[in-house]
Amino acid sequence: MRIFSDRHSRGKAAACAALPGERPCDCKPPCTQQTDNTFLTRFFRNKRGNLAIIFALSLMPLSAAAGAAIDLNRAFIVQQRLERALDAAGLAVGSAPAASDAEMKAMAQSFFDANYNDEEMGVPGELVLAAANGRVTLSATAELPTTIMKIIGYDKLTVGSEIEVVRESKALEVAMVLDNTGSMAWNGKIGALRTAAEDLVSILFGDQDTPDLLTMSLVPFVTAVNIKTPGFDMNWMDVDGNSEFHGENFDPNRGPTNHFELFDGINNASWKGCVEMRPEPYDTLDTAPTLGNADTLFVPYFWPDEPDNGSGYNNNYANDRIGGNKNKRQSNGGKYMNRNVSVDETPSSTEGPNKACARPLVPLTNSKSTLINEVRAMEPWYNSGTNIAEGLAWGWRVLSPGAPFSEGASFGNPDVQKALILLTDGNNEIVSQSTHNDSDYTSFGYVGTGRLGTTNRGTARNIIDQKVAEMCTRVKADGVRIYTITFQLNSSSLAEIFRNCATEPELYFDSPSNEELRRVFQSIAFDLSNLRIAR
């Protein structure tokens, strides 16, 4: 779609608008028109509106001109609101290339009304829509009763605006990679995120339930991501336990070390679907899982039962059944065999081998209802920490044309625009433990095992930061447009990482409040719609 208007350059459109009940953001200055067929009116109708108004005012006595400027300024404001509302309507129509004329008119009117408040100055007339040869023209006028200009015979001004939309069949694929860690439970943040993400889905889908040219994915993350969702394939998994770090927390002399076998031994729990990070270099690559290379396969997340009668541990859910030091008791795989354990998988505080494992991701889908239902179901999950790198990795993978999840079009396809939205409310974080583990269990195991090349939590955080930066570069190299959002976060270092991660500096957003987050998501939604503008 391409939008033209009297004040926009070709191909440009407003990047923000609002849903019903929200106050939209400001747009650019307008021009005005006046209804009476007079010399002054001809200048009002001049598309170079500001010059016309200045010249017209010069013809009046100074006092009358000063008074008329008040009415003309009010007309400017009305023009802004008309143009903003038409932009929103135009973006909605342009993103629905399969809609009929009647459907377009209803859709455009709905978005126009939502963006032109009844309480605002000016009474808008009917929205006029004309469609031909793939082009849609939208126009509207509003009448504004005058105040000072009544004295010189002008009772009202009619302000008009018009845009042209070229509808195009360019597809859009969007991955929302959203922080669902425990800190999102504070200050109403998870509720604000649900609302903002639902706004984005609603704006992009408009009135269409299953559009042909739009698919979206949702990737909630903690330190791990849950991939057990429709389309999941066990061929992606390290079933035989051969990956480099599979079973590193268990003693092979005291029972199974394969995480699938450990789950099989528990009578009242099964693998929920979270996976560990792959070993380097595959942790930051989109390499497809291959049965002949175990390190490309994914290891099921299994938080070990931590020792009985020990302080500082966050997940003690089974009887140790043996004596010895804490490491010996924790690494005993035999205690899971044919046993019932204490399990609680209800967020936010959980217990058991799936502790801190969020809801499954949603692969690319064109189902509006599926996305909205899963957005509304997001919850914060305590413990483990925050691993932005793992969330980003899975956002990249769901957009990829290859396994795991192959719904995405090929990278570089000129008929498809791919985008990724990455949000966090915290730094890459590892929950500490004053224990032999040095941390909570995470998607890269315990810090104390040294899987990241260090047993120091601070150094481990820096390494994860580096992995985020590496992946941002690779994702952008695949032609994916990245938007980044920090939410109620006071961290200059992460802000810099996210600013550099975004495709352009202006696509990084800092949202210090719940209200601002909603405005950010709406702005992103309209920018995403603009990606489908013919240029």
What kind of feature is each model-predicted range?
Residues 2-4, 16, 27, 31, ...:
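Low-complexity, S/T/G/P-rich flexible repeat/linker segments used as non-globular hinges
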Residues 2-3, 98-102, 172, 182-402, ...:
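Divalent-cation-coordinating short motifs within acidic/hydroxyl- or histidine-rich contexts, strongest
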Residues 2-10, 25-105, 182-185, 482, ...:
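Alpha-helical assembly-interface signal, strongest on the long, hydrophobic N-terminal helix that forms
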Residues 17-23:
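N-terminal polybasic/positive-inside topogenic patches
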Residues 92-94, 137-139, 160-166, 173-177, ...:
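Soluble periplasmic/extracytoplasmic beta-strand elements of cell-envelope proteins
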Residues 101-166:
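Extended low-complexity, polyampholyte segments enriched in Ser/Thr/Pro and acidic residues
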Residues 112-118, 471-535:
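Von Willebrand factor A/integrin I-like adhesion domains
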Residues 142-145, 169, 180-185, 222-226, ...:
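Solvent-exposed loop/turn segments at secondary-structure junctions
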